UniProtKB/Swiss-Prot annotation:
Keywords: Ribonucleoprotein, Ribosomal protein, RNA-binding, rRNA-binding. InterPro entries: Ribosomal_uL22, Ribosomal_uL22_bac/chlpt-type, Ribosomal_uL22_bac/org-type, Ribosomal_uL22_CS, Ribosomal_uL22_sf. CDD domains: Ribosomal_L22. One of its GO terms (biological process) is translation. It comes from Aster yellows phytoplasma. This is Large ribosomal subunit protein uL22. Part of the 50S ribosomal subunit. The gene is rplV. NCBIfam families: rplV_bact. SUPFAM superfamilies: Ribosomal protein L22 (SSF54843). Belongs to the universal ribosomal protein uL22 family. This protein binds specifically to 23S rRNA; its binding is stimulated by other ribosomal proteins, e.g. L4, L17, and L20. It is important during the early stages of 50S assembly. It makes multiple contacts with different domains of the 23S rRNA in the assembled 50S subunit and ribosome. It comes from the Bacteria. GO terms for molecular function: rRNA binding; structural constituent of ribosome. One of its GO terms (cellular component) is cytosolic large ribosomal subunit.
Amino acid sequence: METKKPKAIARKVSIAPRKARLVVDLIRGKNIAQAQAILTFTPKVAAPVILKLLNSAVSNAVNNLKLNREQLYVKEVFVNEGLRLKRMFPRAKGSGDMIKKRTSHITLVITSSTNLQTSKEEEQSGSKN
């Protein structure tokens, strides 16, 4: 049986997924203190949103699952494309172009380093099929 993993999801964030992925790639695999420091000093629009999401996931882990804050790290974080809002941009001679305002769904999963060690031990002790 798989243990619960604390996670947080931000949906319909009005940031293009391509721009959000630049920030997300910086914190993948880092411990929580490092990730918060990186996000605090990253001059990208997506950084404050992802920092807020990281703090939410840490709070979920500490309050709901009683995990130790110092042992947490970012296990997986990814950005999926959300809705595209289509807007008209007027051009010359009465024509117009379509502007796609892209949104993102950002998912962040954290885990404890002790959970990682026990899952590796279970994999090694298990038999191969």
